[in-house]
Amino acid sequence: SVSSPDEFFQSGGMKTTAENYPTVETSRQLLMAQARAKVNHFAHTRKLTRTDDQPVVRMNRDTYYSFAVVDVSGGATITLPAVPEGKYISVQPVTEDHRIQPMSYGSGTYQLATHYGKHLYLIVRLDSTFSEEEANALQDAMVIDAGSAEPFRAEPVDKETFVAVENSLRQKLGELVATYGGNVNEG
């Protein structure tokens, strides 16, 4: 297994299929996030998200983001700081097999757990009406408490099949939107 995005694509690696693509792409995203900030630590976007710099698909442009890969194998929590009434803060966990867990809204300490693997990818969103200074102070007040700090590891992947499947799925996107409209991501 590998712990770096630079090692992810290898000849002889696991073949990507349409069925395993969500998990394979999630592994790639976890490795890239872990390269930006070590496990159980945040990588914060200190400015509102630009349309030309989106590490994940369809990020909101009116949101400050913080990302973390958390080892939950020894138990873990995230604490979000207090925000004024009417302001927005949330955390969304994503499992290693790309299951989007229920979001938690507002300040508080939240338990982190997964049904699959040992790690979660956390996406924390902050209201765009905060000034950069306010948002950065809130980001710095976020706390991850984890009983283990093992880095995420993934099986190496064959790049040729990964690219072919990804391109095939992208080509089908127009068809899916035409069929399902705004609900293309549901179900």
Residue ranges and their predicted role:
Residues 2-187:
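A compositional/structural signature for long, glycine/proline-rich flexible linkers
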